[in-house]
Every structure is written in C-alpha cells, then in structure tokens.
C-alpha cells in the first residue's frame, strides 16, 4: 500500500471511530493538551515535592501512601488536602478507620468547615462514594483512609473467624477498574492510605507487603513508602516530633526511588521551615559552621530549632530561600540534561567513526 493510500485508510478509520464512539475518542497525542500539562498539589514538604520530580502529587491519578503505624501517613495526606483547599479546590475524606481528628486536621491547615467527610459502613460503599465524587468533577482530591479498613460487605455480615479468601482484593480490583478512568477524565486526585503486613514463611527478601491485593500497586501512578527514622528532641529532652523518610517506590511521571527526609512536629504537622533549612544547607545556600547557621553575612541562629523559629517569623527570608532552592534545582537539572546531550553526541560521533 502506497503512502497516500495508507493516509486515506487511516483518515477513514478515524472518521468511522469518531462516528461510532464520539468526537475526540481518538486523536493525535500532540493535539491532546492534557497529555502535556500535569496539575499538581503540593505535599507540604518541599524535599518531597522535589523528590517526586513534578512539584507535588499529580491530579487525575491514583496515589498510594503506605508505611507502618504512626509513620505520618494521615498527616501527609491531610497536608495535601489543606494545600488543595488553599488552591481553591474541594477535598473529600473517606474515613473508613473512623479515626480522623478534626482538631489536628485544622491545626495542620485544613478547612474542616469545607472538608467533606464520609464514614461508610463497608468497603463497597466507600469505593462507590469515591467514584461518585470523582464522577461529579467538582472534587479535586479524595483521601481514602485506609485500604485495610475497607471491609467487604459479605465479611461484615459473616461471623468472626469465617475465612474470606481474596474478597478485599477482588473488591479493590473491580473498583479501581472503574475509578481510574473517572479520575483521569475529571482531573481528580485519589489518595489511598495503606498499612503494611508481613508475609508468613519468607526467609529471604523483604517480608513486608501491603493490604488489598496487587491491583492498587498496578493502578497507582505514585507509591510513597513513609517511615519514622528518629525522634526530634526539644527542651528537657522531651520528644517534640519525628524525623520522617519517604521513598518514592513507584513513579510513572518522573524517575522513581528518590528519597526525601523531613520533620513532623506533634502540634504543627510537617515543618516547612525544617525542609527549607535542610535543602538550603545541602545546596550550600546556608552555611553551617558547627551549630551556627549563616546566610550571606547574616547569622540566622545557633541550633536548628532557633533557625526554624527565625524562618517562621521572617516570611520574606523563608520565601527568598525557597526561591533560591528552586533556582539551584533547575540549574542542576539543566546541567544534567546538557551533560546527557553531550554524552549522547559523543557516542554518536564514536559510532560514526567506526
């Protein structure tokens, strides 16, 4: 078949597809504007936003946050909710665990008066509510807390001790098949909080796994493994927070396996000032000598807590450091891209010389 004949055949096929399934059912990827634009919601931790590679969690996708107990999963999800609301968006929280603390959510920055909450009786109801909210197109982010608490209706109606093999996995697989396309169409972000379990009889390798079967792993665009790696001590040696490490276990939108560390303070949530300090020191924007932190010719304070308080007071300094961190990251990315292009060019020259 000649090139003109192939072109006419393709045009006829496209015309027939659009007649059968509607205009826009098939198109050139370059003309599909949403393929180039990724809307994001900030996580509240600048180090994590940078590790994700796109500046936050993407809208229109499924996100999974998993980790052990008291590792900051709900805190991270609530920060994303608060940031979505600050952008003028609408957020919904499906509290299957019946454990959301409205006072703590408000302390973090969530507007609890506008936050929609649902506490369904069974997993099917929870996932149906999430799908209906997403289908409305009026909700920007939906949090499901947690997958482990999504109990199938038949399990609720049965007796304690009854064996229900694969019920939850089948329920999740069926729901996610419907939910994925709806989220993409309405540009809604769905965040699933998940717990970890240990597989019995695993002698080698990692025995940890997440609940709900394999479907969520496949459908998630981003999976974040969140862990507590230490305590933050305050005055009189009392714990005032936790040091958290997040590994991006899966990322369809940027390179995966990057890590980020940040502080979660008990009465504050994620410390944005702490993230700025860590990144500014790492990028040599702030000079750390001993216990003193200096910025240009100015002493910021002695000790990390003193600098944190200074940044919380001085918003202009906070924004200036944040801007310089972004500039440093962009410069590093441009340098890495230029280096990769030079390497590729050198390889092509070497191949041509053979």
Swiss-Prot record:
Annotated family: Belongs to the RecA family.
Gene giving rise to this polypeptide: recA
Protein name as catalogued: Protein RecA
Classification via Pfam families: RecA (PF00154), RecA_C (PF21096)
Gene3D superfamilies from the UniProt entry: P-loop containing nucleotide triphosphate hydrolases (3.40.50.300)
Binding site for ATP: 67-74
Keywords: ATP-binding, Cytoplasm, DNA damage, DNA recombination, DNA repair, DNA-binding, Nucleotide-binding, SOS response
Gene Ontology CC terms, in alphabetical order: cytosol
Entries under PANTHER family matching the protein: MITOCHONDRIAL DNA REPAIR PROTEIN RECA HOMOLOG-RELATED, RECA
GO biological process, one term: SOS response
Task of the protein: Can catalyze the hydrolysis of ATP in the presence of single-stranded DNA, the ATP-dependent uptake of single-stranded DNA by duplex DNA, and the ATP-dependent hybridization of homologous single-stranded DNAs. It interacts with LexA causing its activation and leading to its autocatalytic cleavage.
MF terms in GO: ATP binding; ATP hydrolysis activity; ATP-dependent DNA damage sensor activity; damaged DNA binding; single-stranded DNA binding
Subcellular location field: Cytoplasm
Alphabetized NCBIfam families for the sequence: tigrfam_recA
Principal place of residence: cytoplasm
């Amino acid at each position: 078949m000649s090139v003109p004949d192939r072109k006419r055949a393709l045009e006829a096929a496209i015309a027939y597809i659009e007649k059968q399934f509607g205009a826009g059912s098939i198109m050139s990827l370059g003309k599909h504007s949403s393929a180039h634009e990724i809307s994001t919601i900030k996580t509240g931790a600048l180090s994590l936003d940078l590790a994700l590679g796109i500046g936050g969690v993407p809208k229109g996708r499924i996100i999974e946050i998993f980790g052990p107990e008291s590792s900051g999963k709900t805190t991270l999800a609530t920060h994303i909710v608060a940031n979505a609301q600050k952008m003028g968006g609408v957020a919904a929280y499906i509290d299957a665990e019946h454990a959301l603390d409205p006072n703590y959510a408000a302390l973090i920055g969530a507007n609890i008066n506008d936050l929609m909450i649902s506490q369904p009786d069974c997993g099917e109801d929870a996932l149906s509510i999430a799908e209906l909210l997403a289908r409305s197109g009026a909700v920007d982010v939906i949090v499901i807390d947690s997958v482990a608490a999504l109990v199938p209706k038949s399990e609720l109606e049965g007796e304690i001790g009854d064996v229900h093999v694969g019920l939850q996995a089948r329920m999740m697989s069926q729901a996610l098949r419907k939910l994925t396309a709806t989220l993409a169409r309405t540009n809604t972000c769905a965040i699933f909080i998940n717990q970890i379990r240990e597989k019995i009889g695993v002698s080698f390798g990692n025995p940890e796994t997440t609940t709900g079967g394999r479907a969520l792993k496949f459908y998630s665009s981003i999976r974040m493994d969140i862990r507590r790696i230490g305590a933050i001590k305050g005055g009189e040696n009392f714990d005032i927070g936790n040091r958290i490490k997040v590994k991006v276990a899966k990322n369809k939108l940027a390179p995966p396996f990057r890590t980020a560390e940040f502080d979660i303070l008990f009465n504050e949530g994620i410390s944005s000032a702490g993230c700025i300090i860590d990144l500014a020191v790492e990028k040599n924007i702030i000079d750390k000598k001993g216990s003193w932190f200096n910025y240009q010719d100015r002493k910021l304070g002695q000790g990390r807590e003193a600098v944190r308080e200074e940044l919380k007071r001085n918003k202009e300094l906070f924004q200036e450091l944040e801007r310089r961190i972004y500039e440093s990251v962009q410069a590093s990315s441009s340098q890495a891209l230029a280096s990769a292009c030079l390497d590729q060019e050198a390889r092509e020259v070497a191949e041509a010389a053979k």
